[in-house]
Amino acid sequence: MSSIFGENIVSDSIVNMELTNPDNTTTMHPIYETNIEKEVQQEFSDNVSEKETIDSTKSKISLENIQQEMGALAKKIFHKLGVKATDLGFSNEHDDSQDSLQTLAPSPSYVPLLKVIGSSEEVNSNLVLTDLETNTDGYDPKFLISVRKFLMGSPNSGFVVKHEKRLPDGPRVLALRAISSVDEENRKERLSPDSDPVETESVYVDNGELSNQKVETVEISEKEQNDDPAGYSQYLLEFKKSKCQKKVPTLESIEENEGTEPHDNLTFMTDLGTPYYSLGNEFERKQILDEYGLLANDENLVIGHTLRAEYCFMFDESDILQLRNYEHTEKELSVLQFKGVSSRWDFRCCREERLLRLLLCFDSEHTGQSFIQLNDPENENEKEEQNSISIRELSYFSTKLISLILPKEAHKQRYIMLSSLAKTREADFFWSEEEKTNYTNELLSNPCKFLCELDHFDSFPHQQQDLLWKYLAEFSASLELDPNLALWKKQVIFSKIGHPKLLVMPISSFHCVQRFPDLVCVQTSTAETFLSVDRELTTYDLNTIKLLNTAPSRTAQNWLFIMHHLEIVGYLFPHLVHLDKQYSLLDYAKSVEHIPELGTVQRKGFLNKVAFDDNEALLYQV
């Protein structure tokens, strides 16, 4: 995901990045080298021949005209290269020399983004739209408007739901598809009153693999539907309400529709785990989106409609316990063994509940309104309507769904307001060299003041921001024990990738997870969080790609991925960047008197975490 606060963005295509090939960012593609050189030579030769024939009275060309000609020539070159001129903004500013560490990147600006979730085969089916100007041809326009209205436009919505490309087809569409799949003779027999039911097959996801589901029957009563469309719609509404009262099967088990009464004239195929609403039923759509908006309140993640193969459970029941060698408290154990009514999940971990926190938000009378109801995999044949949560499902919901974080509308407005304030201050702000030195020394003597300044970073004039960037590079690099990490981290900070407050977090807090290369464990002194990183389907600017390719370790790559993805994590994830002035993630002392002990405290904390980084060699073999 491109930077929220601003680096140059390659918005017109997805950069499929190969981390093992650092030449992608430093050399021109060989296909273009010869052709472009010839094109450039031809352009210049044509210009020279034309200028030799110009009359002497017209030979005086203004500087402006020359600049226009060179600009047009540059556009032709960029067009043949297939890139934008703005995409090359970092090509000359950042090299491997020591001087590049002292060159700050241009000030960023707020840019809305388009994030793709899913594998490369599902690019067109799993899109999260965050840019109002994104080309949405082929998408359900009413649905997109509803998503933006009830999710993105709501001041209480901080997260965007992963939706399908279109709403699930209603029973009538499915029926027509089943009918059109056979020849004319069979279709006539199927539409006759005495015909046998149409049988078809559907596929469901079981532990990340596709398998054949037991055949569900689709019975069509075309005559009744055409004769009484109002009654048919009422029947669908009643049928949906009755279906909602039953628990939705998980990906681990499938509940057969044995409760369907014989006189039901329509049994339709549904994607397991997907709330049903018929095509064109705007009331149902609005109700679902409204409830999704409610679930998005209080900074809680919202679970999408469907879980595809890439989003299935990633752990066995024993893996989550062995993952970080948890020693569960009684309270945590009660969470893991919880059995009760439907629930939703708050993914902010705390000291007492390091996995996640369960919030009961549905009354038992409204169980059918919840979108995720989990069955006990050990009781697949149990017909009683009883919900339980397994360790596998806990691990799934606490990791993979944390893949996209967006700012709330209030945060966007706050950023715009602070940026306007900074521009206002810019006119009357000037510091002499002595004042700059005093300011830097004050930050050096009081780290807590430095972090408080980062809280208000966006409201400061440009000159003060540059001082904070430079001090941040030195301060953040000093937290790393590895000199190579420290030097590389300086390059990242001077490139202005990520929010300044988040860049304070040491790379030592980010860990690889054995056997799961897409997972990153972020460990602080009071919280542990598992984040999912999409390495391939994310758009990066050229400078970020170069930094990723030159990262000293995989842990450093994970750190940069998180910096790039979650720029405003300081606002949305208080368990990562604490709002109290102690800033326990850095083991800061509460008072300035204890600042000299800071290095010892931090070093002890880092040494305790080295064991997790030792697994990194194993991960390269995954």
Curated annotation (Swiss-Prot):
Superkingdom to which the source organism belongs: Eukaryota
Biological process annotations from GO: meiotic cell cycle
Keywords: Meiosis
GO cellular component, one term: cytosol
Official protein name in the record: Meiotic expression up-regulated protein 25
Organism: Schizosaccharomyces pombe (strain 972 / ATCC 24843)
